[in-house]
Amino acid sequence: MNNIPKLMSGVYLTGHGGLDKLVYREDIPVPTPQAGEVLIEVKGAGVNNTDINTRLGWYSKKVTSDTNAGGREGLQEVDDDDASWSDVPLQFPRIQGGDICGIIVQVGEGVEQNRIGTRILVRSMQNIPTKDNPLAMQTMGSEVDGGFAQYCVAKAKESFPINCEWSDTELASIPISYSTAEGMLCRADIQKETILITGASGGVGSAAIQLAKVRG
């Protein structure tokens, strides 16, 4: 795990807009994990609507059209000041990718060395409470760099060990879709009962089916 390069390949998001805002690079500095963080060699990274919406700036309050209207060329009415998931201007260039499966290859101060070599999934949305906002959140690939590169850093406490026969690609489809579905089921207080899940063919819908089945 010591053969960590200084540079890596990845995709930069250079601003809100169309596909031209995505730039593939092979000279991106490999990040260094800070205290409480781990460096992850990315093995799989899912693409979901949050990545697309963030690129477009669709979360801006000025946007009234749907994402299909600007998927390739971008949207015209975006205000960069509130175009992110958290209403905070993004810092560019940004590496997107909120769904991350990988291997811990280096740890920062305060993180146990025995975590190196662990296969993990990263929680996509992470609580970062402040005095003024106890519910403040950050999203991988939005407020901080995500998994669309060979390496990324994440908080150690948000990187969960996985012991599973699923492939890296399969596991990379889990974090956002399953956490969204679980939140919906918890909010609806689903117990052992028969329910109808509409739109069940997508990532969140299919996750909701599996999580509902676990409840009996």
Model-derived features with residue positions:
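Glycine- and charge-enriched low-complexity intrinsically disordered segments
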Residues: 150-160, 166, 177
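A structural motif shared across PLP-dependent enzymes of the aminotransferase-like
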Residues: 127-128, 142-156
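Glycine-rich beta-strand-centered segment in the early N-terminal region that forms part
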Residues: 29-45, 59-126
